[in-house]
């Protein structure tokens, strides 16, 4: 069967530069690599074909001979002397791929580091008062901690982990297929470079044990829902002495019966009767620091906001303290006595009717607009 053209195999032109050839080879080699196509004979044959084409086209001498004589340049009895018997030179492709195949096929260079401990998250519910003023709380969390018998090594007390005889402590083994070499994680030690001959009786060689621990967490003043507090090194212990992870405390502020928070400002609704709204007066309102008197001017309309400076939340990042904004809500009276109803009827008549346009600017404006609307319709 006639051999395919090397340029055609790699999908490059006859004038392709070496970097184009390397790029094409990487792409095709990853696609047809035996580790990715186990048991696929067709893929294995293509992979060998791709390697052969690559070795010729990246060797200046061999490429020149191939361009002049084709496949005949490498056949026995072909060009004088040949090129060392074809493709048995054992070229090392690890410089081309570096860690590319290492990542794909479980390799990588050097000993695999022991894994850092996992980060943990704890959801903490706070009242608004706790969030505004700050608080210290104790929490209890389940975690993995370093074994106190072997101190994280996993080995029996008085012994040490031994160097792996398979990889000689490197954590890696090299698999070679013809000209192609791939580094893989040592299957004997799982990349650690050491083996535990006599495991610790408490952690059974893991170096970590399950425990619950109690921590005191200081919550700074001014935190809000969504804020996270990081406690470095308070997560799970790392494997075999590796650094511990971190603990993240996630803040959730409970709903308050009186106040709503927006940033560093607090809002509350203050109900008043229509007599106070009309005549003015003082009313007691709550703040997080205690009760204060709010002066309501005469002719106050419902929805009006009164700002009490410095009665809000102090920023957790420093800076000025927020304000308390009181929204006045004028309530319609209910449960009126006959006397009260009569007084209101007399008051209504003094306003000049139900609309009370003389004493109600918004009513006058509204009904003037309604009158104009109907006048325009009838024209």
Swiss-Prot record:
It comes from Salmonella typhimurium (strain LT2 / SGSC1412 / ATCC 700720). It holds the Pfam family DnaJ. Coiled coil: none annotated. Homodimer. A zinc finger (CR-type) spans 134-212. Keywords: Chaperone, Cytoplasm, DNA replication, Metal-binding, Repeat, Stress response, Zinc, Zinc-finger. Its main location: cytoplasm. Its cofactor is Zn(2+). The J domain is necessary and sufficient to stimulate DnaK ATPase activity. Zinc center 1 plays an important role in the autonomous, DnaK-independent chaperone activity of DnaJ. Zinc center 2 is essential for interaction with DnaK and for DnaJ activity. Signal peptide: none annotated. Residues 5-70 form the J domain. One of its GO terms (biological process) is DNA replication. GO terms for cellular component: cytoplasm. Participates actively in the response to hyperosmotic and heat shock by preventing the aggregation of stress-denatured proteins and by disaggregating proteins, also in an autonomous, DnaK-independent fashion. Unfolded proteins bind initially to DnaJ; upon interaction with the DnaJ-bound protein, DnaK hydrolyzes its bound ATP, resulting in the formation of a stable complex. GrpE releases ADP from DnaK; ATP binding to DnaK triggers the release of the substrate protein, thus completing the reaction cycle. GO terms for molecular function: ATP binding; heat shock protein binding; unfolded protein binding; zinc ion binding. HAMAP family: DnaJ (MF_01152). This is Chaperone protein DnaJ. SUPFAM superfamilies: Chaperone J-domain, DnaJ/Hsp40 cysteine-rich domain, HSP40/DnaJ peptide-binding domain. It is found in: Cytoplasm. Binds 2 Zn(2+) ions per monomer. Belongs to the DnaJ family. Zn(2+) 1 binds at residues 147, 150, 200, 203. CXXCXGXG motif repeats lie at residues 147-154, 164-171, 186-193, 200-207. Induction: By heat shock under the control of the HtpR regulatory protein. Zn(2+) 2 binds at residues 164, 167, 186, 189. PANTHER family: CHAPERONE PROTEIN DNAJ (PTHR43096:SF48), DNAJ HOMOLOG 1, MITOCHONDRIAL-RELATED (PTHR43096).
